[in-house]
Amino acid sequence: MNKSKIQKFAVDGHKLLYKQIAQRAYQYGIEEENVGKADATEVRGRILSPLEKSQRAALIAEINANGYQQTIERVTYIWFNRIVALRFMEVNNYLPSHIRVFSDASGAFKPEILNDVLHLEMEGLDKAQIAEYIENNNTEELYRYLLLTQCAELKAALPDIFVFGARDRDYTELLFPNNSLS
């Protein structure tokens, strides 16, 4: 096995993920030089949902306590570990649903979870939310929702990797990168 290729992949993947997470923080009005007000109800012209407001406030509190770079780096490591664990579980058929999150059975990046969404049984899955995403043809948000729900379901089995705080306080969920289907 060529370990240098794996190391390069991990380093490059980490750098890309860090940039994507920092971009996501930026979308919520959080920058290294200015984290903004924790009680904001609107950011960059977009009104925040109650869940987003709570998660954003928790993120700002974490940044104020530990610094911007350290917080973004921590979230990057958390998501990197979650993605690697999900992929490992997917390839080895360890996921409780036995439905792949990142690929299809042939290994192509065509998430089975999107194809089997109407038959999916997962703890915490909101069928009405799924129907709304499908109705609005919002595949990216549907995929994001399914991936986050899969992570939340796995926290009982693997709390060290998939630990989420109270759902409204877990800012790592807020920072999961956009365009995860790209």
Locate each region found by the language model.
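Charged, often flexible domain-edge or linker segments that flank or initiate folded functional domains
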Residues: M1-S182
